[in-house]
Amino acid sequence: MQQLTQKLGSGEMVIQEVPYPQLGKGMIIVKNHYSIISTGTEGSTVTAARKSLLGKAKERPQQVKQVIDTLKKQGPIQTYRAVMKKLDAYSPLGYSCSGEVVEVGEGVTEFVVGDKVACAGAGYANHAEIVSVPVNLCVKLNIEANLKDAAYNTLGAISMQGVRQADLRIGESCVIIGLGLLGQLAAQILKASGVTVIGVDVSEAAVNKSVENNSIDLGFFRDTDGIENKIQNITKGHGADAVIIAAATNSLDPINFAGAVARKKGKVVVLGAVPTGFQRDPFWYKKELELKMACSYGPGRYDLNYEEKGIDYPLPYVRWTEKRNMEAFQNLIVTKKINIGYLTTHEFEFENANAAFNLVVSRSEPFTGIALKYNTVKAPSKSKISTSKSENLGKINISFIGAGSYAQGNLLPYIPKTSDVGRIGILTNSGTTSKRVSEKFNFQFCATKENDILDDKTNTVFIATRHDSHGSYVLKSLKANKNVFVEKPMCLLESELNDIIKEQKKTGKTVMVGFNRRFSPLTKKLKKAMGNNPMTMLYRINAGAIPSNNWIQDSEIGGGRVIGEVCHFIDYLTFMNGSIPIKISASAIPDAYNLNDTLNILVQFKNGSSGVIAYYANGSKSMACLLYTSDAADDRV
């Protein structure tokens, strides 16, 4: 199937043939009919990507800081690889679309094949022929819904959340600063709710368009003389009950202007990307104004449990989640309480998406909403995609399931480039990643399904996915009679471990876990010097903090840091003393999120050795990450 992508390094935009998306649990696969270009968010992303490296650095100072931090922690080589990986990658674009359901995943009950739906979410609702989207980022549409209008789903939900943050009542007034897509959508939602809407924009054309299409009650060009007094008069001398800033600018004018036109104890809601360093006097302090932010589509946004796992918030306690915001927006469209049609000033066939984005970047003519239309008659290919002319097979023929940052930095570059090793297939959740990795590392194809990887060509499978899928992929690979290399941990559940042991004994195939530290040259020297005599050992890891909402900390997906990472150090101590553990005890310090990732572990071994693993998530960044000592060693590592 085809997908629009952009390379961050050069800004090049390409419609690529990429693998058909995988259907995960709690997800649906949708054939797109329309997708909408966010001329603000996507426009700035595309524009920044086309700048020089210096221009990119100026545009994204926070990412420059991340690079510097990585350099301090991991050194120049790993930092260079990480930066180049990012710059060389083709990233998907798009986050708002509509279409019809063509497949339904496990556990999905609210959608069936053939349903009309609207979808949201960067990385999900892409500009692509086919998308795979979690259920809480999709809404079912009325059978009579206009799919072009419905494709404004994400933008509508963002505007809706801004309106909800303003918390206005019938008869109250609101000034909207910025009459682009978000501003005009928010204005229509407010008008449908009985609120008097006053629109302000730096573009007279935007103001005129909003007035002509009845999106606002009154409109003003920002440079209109005496604009503050005019708004005071309209609001009977009080000022607006709320101001919604839907502009995108580096100027402080919107936030200070909002203070000037809001009433005493009024609200200012920031919906767009603007700085908030307002002047305290003469308005903000004396009026005791309330500044509120609108977080994207609404409650549930950026929450892994809500968006990826599909765990809803109870309606009596969280009335308007991001999904319910989308549903409310779609209801306003289908009941004709708001008018979306006039917002679409340009429509391009998907094949001409480059021209659409060139219009956004160059601004060669006025535009508001830009829709991409898809060929829904053509059936997208589900076949694997060839990425190399070579079909050579070696003694060892490798395929990868999962090829994210770790695999690209620490596994794939070190596969021997000899005739004994054949590079067969790549399978990842992201079609763009599969394609790029397969091409970069000279694999024969990128896959669309597991069976492509577990075919007769492959005899060795590398598994580098998220931790929760390790166990099942190891088991499937063994049952397909493959040797397996799996990144740590091998699995998360004891039941999975038992099944793997049973299957390995049955097939006799090799299963290797990525405990790479035992193979380092220095470790080999230490091992040779110390032998297998009983010893006391200390392994201190200054691991650093990982946020509680990171997938690694999720007990179901990452398993937590003890299962996910500390297993590595237990293996190291086991290797160093040449004996297996017989007793383990641990003690963690309390933390607010019950992560238990700052702890001491005491391990006793069969040969009488003992080891302490001191794993600290709260250590100083200035301290070395790793320290290994032993009474049998002369030096520290």
Question: What feature does the model see in each segment?
Answer:
Residues M1-P92, T335, G369-K384, D634:
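Short N-terminal strand-loop motif that marks the start
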Residues Q78-A89, S96-A122, D635:
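A glycine-/small-residue-rich N-terminal strand-loop-strand element
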Residues G123, N146-T224:
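Mid-domain Rossmann-like dinucleotide-binding core that forms the NAD(H)/NADP(H) cofactor-binding site
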Residues I245-P254, A447-I501:
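Beta-loop-alpha module in the N-terminal Rossmann-like domain of NAD(P)-dependent dehydrogenases
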Residues G272-E288, M490-K509:
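Rossmann-fold NAD(P)-binding glycine/threonine-rich loop
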Residues P299-Y317, R517-S587, A592:
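Predominantly a Rossmann-like dinucleotide-binding segment in NAD(P)-dependent oxidoreductases
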Residues A379-F441:
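N-terminal Rossmann-like dinucleotide-binding module
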Residues Y628-D635:
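Conserved small/polar residues in nucleotide/adenosyl-binding loops
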